């Protein structure tokens, strides 16, 4: 299966799981609580190479994945919807779709709240004040509340890359240097 087909499959699985979880959370009136728990799950994945390996590696059996996720649910107190969701995903051998499901849940919840999502890449972590100012600026441009997903990528050297929907604003130092380099090649 080509790589593009694989990522579409993962995306489709992730979106179906996220959509189902969102509907259940909406019925229970716990969308915000579920979102907060999913953020905690993502932080755990990001902070642990072992957990990351468990999530992405097909080497682990369904039983091993289920036992590990059950222990995680117990240890960190994920109860109710998120605890059951994690166990179902593990039991069905779909842990590979967990990060995508978390991202899809965030997007569905934001859309439900009337927000749009901006993916921001920065060379350094943004302070709370910078993030607040960025949200206000983007709200002024789009006319909607904006949820910001910040990714730190030191390779952009400085500035920001902001993606909102199909629009991208690239003020990164890396892009400016590349543009300058091309301009100098044309002159020389």
UniProtKB/Swiss-Prot annotation:
It is found in: Cell inner membrane. It is a peripheral membrane protein. The gene is atpH. The keyword Cell membrane applies. One of its GO terms (cellular component) is proton-transporting ATP synthase complex. Belongs to the ATPase delta chain family. GO terms for molecular function: proton-transporting ATP synthase activity, rotational mechanism. It comes from Sinorhizobium fredii (strain NBRC 101917 / NGR234). F-type ATPases have 2 components, F(1) - the catalytic core - and F(0) - the membrane proton channel. F(1) has five subunits: alpha(3), beta(3), gamma(1), delta(1), epsilon(1). F(0) has three main subunits: a(1), b(2) and c(10-14). The alpha and beta chains form an alternating ring which encloses part of the gamma chain. F(1) is attached to F(0) by a central stalk formed by the gamma and epsilon chains, while a peripheral stalk is formed by the delta and b chains. The keyword Nucleotide-binding does not apply. It holds the Pfam family OSCP. Keywords: ATP synthesis, Cell inner membrane, Cell membrane, CF(1), Hydrogen ion transport, Ion transport, Membrane, Transport. It comes from the Bacteria. InterPro entries: ATP_synth_OSCP/delta_N_sf, ATPase_OSCP/d_CS, ATPase_OSCP/dsu. This is ATP synthase subunit delta. F(1)F(0) ATP synthase produces ATP from ADP in the presence of a proton or sodium gradient. F-type ATPases consist of two structural domains, F(1) containing the extramembraneous catalytic core and F(0) containing the membrane proton channel, linked together by a central stalk and a peripheral stalk. During catalysis, ATP synthesis in the catalytic domain of F(1) is coupled via a rotary mechanism of the central stalk subunits to proton translocation. This protein is part of the stalk that links CF(0) to CF(1). It either transmits conformational changes from CF(0) to CF(1) or is implicated in proton conduction.
